[in-house]
A protein has these predicted regions:
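C-terminal catalytic domains of large/alpha subunits in multi-subunit enzymes
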Residues: 1-224
Length: 224
């Protein structure tokens, strides 16, 4: 959209019709209009405050619909989907949980920059691990961050990222977002891994050793 608007600006500067074509040679733009070649020398144009010769800004508001009386609708234009699988190891005597591996599958639309997306997923998995096992803040309690634990590089397991490309009709080049989407599934995946390993359900995060031990004792079978 911005490119089309910039094209129209160039055609107007050259005095060419809308159906003319544009060619670029040695810092000059040439509008070709019914055999006429109409040059525009960009080197003689003043720069804007950002150092550009010509710019155009376009705003695109993707189509959405409000929720109806039943709470149904499309308040967002694009929806991403993701699922995480966590392989964990639980020490039933100490209540400690170690995450061995995370597999993360995400529908990202068109993966324009796969390396950047993988980094986003890995970072989200790290944040989710902290949410699941370490990080806890109680409003009104605690005078500093001394006891607020966060994951270190030694806590982060290998993360296998699976990118699913189901393109969006409104995203740029078919892309979708991958922000909180990488954080949200991690903690549930880890808690499900704990349940699969020893049969307990931890209902409150973080799953600290004392909470895991309490759940084991409540189950009545420390060996799982």
């Amino acid at each position: 959209m911005a490119g089309k608007a910039l094209r129209q600006t160039l055609l107007r500067m050259a005095g060419a019709c809308d159906c003319a074509s544009l060619e670029f040679h040695d810092g000059r733009v040439i509008a070709v209009d019914n055999g006429r070649r109409l040059p525009i020398d960009l080197t003689h144009l003043p720069l804007d405050p950002h150092g550009y010769v010509l710019t155009r800004e376009i705003t695109f508001d993707p189509p959405t619909s409000p929720l109806d009386e039943n709470g149904q609708g499309n308040p967002y234009a694009v929806y991403g989907f993701g699922a995480h699988l966590a392989e964990v190891q639980v020490d039933v005597e100490l209540g400690t949980v170690r995450v061995l591996r995370i597999t993360a599958a995400h529908d990202v639309g068109r993966a324009i920059n796969p390396t950047l997306i993988e980094g986003q997923v890995q970072g989200g998995a790290a944040q989710g691990l902290g949410m699941a096992l370490m990080e806890e803040f109680t409003p009104g309690k605690g005078e500093n961050l001394h006891d607020y634990l966060i994951p270190t590089v030694g806590d982060i397991p290998p993360v296998e990222t699976i990118l699913i490309e189901k393109c969006s009709s409104v995203g740029p080049f078919g892309a979708k977002g991958i922000g909180e989407q990488a954080v949200i599934p991690t903690a549930p995946a880890i808690l499900n891994g704990i349940h699969d390993a020893i049969g307990i359900r931890v209902r409150k995060v973080p799953a600290t050793p004392d909470r895991v031990r309490a759940a084991i004792l409540a189950l009545g079978s420390p060996g799982g």
